[in-house]
């Protein structure tokens, strides 16, 4: 126990993090059982809070018993425990291992605050398995880097303080401390790749080469260092290729990050261009694409015909092109049929997380100084005020323009990306456009007695 608490403390101190809370990823297995003891002791010594999160996957008939047992152990240490129940769609085509892992980290995210540290119980044997799985998939240096000892996690951090410790060492410490733990029967199922490596591959390799674990971890560390160095050397190229949203619309874009200049990318070699796209996706917290997907991003999206509206679905987002820029866009609902009345001095909540519209009458001299506010007059209004998202067949005459045009053409002129054109609210007076929020006011409603603010 003494050497493990020293290892635990050393890793946290070397990370230079000063958490106000430790959150323990607590499955109840031997690794996390020892981790809980270490975290509770560290928290008590350093005067910080220690909490735990147990994820109930519902995959085992024993899952309820495990949750109850975890609660008992946490109570004995005065550690608060949150039990998160998740459901997995095991028929979606993804491996159960990946589904469970993704669900766990989504559950952990629900309990993380800024400045927290989530500690997890992975050890050197887990690192070896992760490396071999990446090798089996044909991963490059990034995948072969395996698990980092410290990594960002939203506004918090994940720390793996036992990554240099063997599974046998953890089990020996658990026995020395007189601990009990749960045994997940699925860990013996050789249909799962990680279990196959653990029970069939690793013993043979380590019997032949006793230091094989340490050698693999050294290779993983070297891969991580090379990746970090390459990112550092190419950061200036990425910054040159990155751009802000070129759209003049203030619409909520649902873009995950800045856009990427196709002109800038085209100046580089195939290898460098692919690397910059990977770096961009990494900055957007997206899983790394395969080589085939990278080629599709460039060939079928970036290099599509000028009049095309190309897109590529990548995981749960879309890669889109607009104004010779690549965008990462969240999958969104079709709001074409959505409409709602709105009253003066009332707020209207928009669908699909698009914020709300504040509409109010203003007297002379009391207008808002907020630059996002649009001012107009309703003295000529004679219809029902409503908000719609469907621009089909609708025309408007923006203030300062010589004539009216279809909204479809105006959206193009105002450089609104195609995926936002049915997500930009249109304020209507009956069948006439008063304003397109974030873009313009119609000439027929020019004035200062009313103002609208679209808060995203």
Swiss-Prot record:
GO BP term, pick one: tRNA modification
Positions contributing to ATP binding: 27-32
Family annotation (SUPFAM superfamilies): Adenine nucleotide alpha hydrolases-like (SSF52402), MesJ substrate recognition domain-like (SSF82829), PheT/TilS domain (SSF56037)
Domain of life (superkingdom): Bacteria
UniProt key word Disulfide bond: no
GO molecular function: ATP binding; tRNA(Ile)-lysidine synthase activity
Subcellular location: Cytoplasm
GO cellular component, one term: cytoplasm
KW ATP-binding (keyword) present: yes
Keyword entries, A-Z: ATP-binding, Cytoplasm, Ligase, Nucleotide-binding, tRNA processing
Main location: cytoplasm
Pfam families attached to this UniProt entry: ATP_bind_3, TilS, TilS_C
EC number, as in UniProt: 6.3.4.19
Catalytic activity: cytidine(34) in tRNA(Ile2) + L-lysine + ATP = lysidine(34) in tRNA(Ile2) + AMP + diphosphate + H(+)
Class of the enzyme per the UniProt entry, highest EC level: ligase
Function: Ligates lysine onto the cytidine present at position 34 of the AUA codon-specific tRNA(Ile) that contains the anticodon CAU, in an ATP-dependent manner. Cytidine is converted to lysidine, thus changing the amino acid specificity of the tRNA from methionine to isoleucine.
PANTHER family linked: TRNA(ILE)-LYSIDINE SYNTHASE-RELATED
Domain notes: The N-terminal region contains the highly conserved SGGXDS motif, predicted to be a P-loop motif involved in ATP binding.
HAMAP family: tRNA_Ile_lys_synt
Annotated family: Belongs to the tRNA(Ile)-lysidine synthase family.
Protein name (database record): tRNA(Ile)-lysidine synthase
């Amino acid at each position: 126990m003494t050497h493990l608490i020293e290892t635990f403390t050393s890793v946290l101190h070397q990370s230079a993090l000063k958490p106000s809370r430790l959150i323990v990823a607590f499955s109840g297995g031997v690794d996390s059982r020892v981790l809980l003891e270490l975290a509770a002791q560290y928290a008590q010594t350093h005067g910080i809070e220690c909490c735990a999160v147990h994820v109930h996957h519902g995959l085992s008939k024993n899952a309820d018993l495990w949750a109850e047992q975890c609660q008992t152990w946490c109570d004995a240490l005065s550690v608060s425990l949150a039990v998160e129940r998740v459901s997995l769609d095991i028929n979606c085509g993804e491996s159960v291992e990946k589904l469970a892992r993704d669900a766990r980290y989504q559950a952990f995210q629900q309990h993380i605050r800024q400045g927290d540290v989530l500690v997890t119980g992975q050890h050197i044997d887990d690192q070896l398995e992760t490396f071999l799985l990446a090798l089996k998939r044909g991963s490059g240096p990034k995948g072969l880097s395996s698990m980092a000892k410290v990594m960002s996690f939203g506004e918090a951090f994940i720390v793996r303080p036992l990554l240099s410790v063997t599974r046998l060492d953890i089990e020996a410490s658990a026995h020395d401390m007189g601990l009990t733990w749960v045994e997940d029967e699925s860990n013996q199922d050789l249909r799962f790749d990680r279990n196959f490596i653990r029970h069939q591959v690793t013993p043979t390799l380590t019997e032949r080469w006793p230091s094989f674990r340490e050698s693999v971890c050294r290779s993983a560390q070297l891969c991580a260092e090379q990746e970090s160095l390459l990112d550092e050397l190419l950061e200036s190229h990425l910054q040159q290729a990155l751009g802000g949203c070129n759209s003049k619309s203030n619409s909520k874009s649902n873009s995950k990050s800045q856009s990427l200049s196709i002109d800038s990318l085209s100046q580089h070699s195939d290898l460098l261009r692919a690397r910059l796209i990977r770096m961009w996706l990494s900055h957007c917290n997206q899983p790394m694409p395969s080589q085939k997907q990278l080629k599709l991003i460039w060939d079928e999206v970036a290099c599509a015909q000028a009049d095309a509206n190309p897109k590529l679905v990548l995981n749960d987002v879309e890669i889109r092109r607009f104004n010779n820029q690549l965008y990462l866009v969240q999958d969104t609902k079709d709001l074409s049929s959505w409409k709602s009345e709105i009253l003066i001095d009332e707020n209207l909540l928009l669908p699909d997380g698009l914020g709300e519209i504040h509409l109010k009458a203003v007297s002379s001299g009391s207008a808002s100084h907020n630059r996002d506010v649009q001012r107009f007059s309703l003295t000529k209004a004679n219809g029902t005020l409503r908000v719609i998202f469907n621009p089909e067949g609708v025309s408007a005459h923006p203030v300062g323009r010589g004539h009216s045009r279809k909204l479809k053409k105006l959206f193009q002129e105002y450089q609104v990306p195609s995926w936002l054109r049915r997500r930009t609210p249109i304020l209507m007076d009956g069948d006439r456009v008063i304003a397109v929020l974030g873009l313009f006011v119609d000439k027929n409603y020019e004035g200062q007695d009313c103002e609208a603010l679209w808060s995203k």
